[in-house]
């Protein structure tokens, strides 16, 4: 499951970067990540950074999250967050836009783990089954998460028990996800 998830993420990343190249003539670009150090940075101009995915250089685990909550995480979630450094990538699944949360740098990896811990603590306080977010949506009240019990990818409404299965696994989500370029500059 780990290798399959990592490969599916690499494949989606390649499709995403290829689309950027096709539409703009250059690698993915981001204004939000401008000025933030990362091994992904290829070049910068006056207000944006051009980037490409890079190999993950830290220990490939989410041990800090597991220790903080005394929980074993779905191996696919660990693979998703520890396969590469990259900027967040947008795509559509069945017409629904989403943005995959990615790790931009070693420092960002700490922030992502802290946010995962916060999300799991919230789920525990609400007496809900544990989930781990992997993508955002246009709505601040909904996220794309992985059910830590089943491994299914779900659209969940934060603070409620409302959830909808959208893929049987992260791998299947990434295979079905179509790259989407939101702001493409030439």
From Swiss-Prot:
UniProt xrefs under InterPro entries: Syd, Syd_sf
GO cellular component, one term: cytoplasmic side of plasma membrane
Subcellular location(s) per record: Cell inner membrane
Record membrane topology: Peripheral membrane protein
Presence of the UniProt keyword RNA-binding in the record: no
Transmembrane segments: none
Coiled-coil residue windows: none
Function: Interacts with the SecY protein in vivo. May bind preferentially to an uncomplexed state of SecY, thus functioning either as a chelating agent for excess SecY in the cell or as a regulatory factor that negatively controls the translocase function.
Family statement: Belongs to the Syd family.
Protein's name in the database: Protein Syd
Lineage of the organism: Bacteria, Pseudomonadati, Pseudomonadota, Gammaproteobacteria, Enterobacterales
Gene expressing this chain: syd
């Amino acid at each position: 499951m780990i290798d399959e998830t990592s490969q599916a993420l690499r494949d989606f990343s390649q499709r995403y970067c290829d689309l950027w190249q096709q539409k703009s003539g250059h690698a993915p670009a981001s204004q939000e990540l401008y000025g933030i150090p990362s091994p992904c940075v290829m070049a910068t101009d006056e207000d944006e950074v051009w980037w490409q995915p890079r190999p993950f250089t830290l220990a490939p685990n989410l041990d800090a999250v597991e220790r903080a909550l005394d929980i074993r995480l779905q191996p696919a979630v660990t693979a998703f967050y520890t396969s590469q450094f990259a900027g967040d990538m947008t795509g559509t699944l069945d017409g629904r836009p989403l943005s995959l949360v990615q790790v931009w740098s070693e420092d960002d990896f700490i922030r992502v783990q802290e946010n995962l811990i916060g999300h799991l603590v919230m789920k525990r306080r609400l007496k809900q089954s544990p989930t781990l977010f992997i993508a955002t949506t246009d709505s601040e009240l909904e996220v794309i998460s992985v059910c830590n019990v089943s491994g299914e990818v779900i659209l969940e409404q934060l603070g409620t028990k409302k959830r909808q299965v959208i893929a049987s696994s992260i791998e299947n989500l990434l295979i079905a996800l179509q790259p989407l370029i939101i702001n493409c500059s030439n």
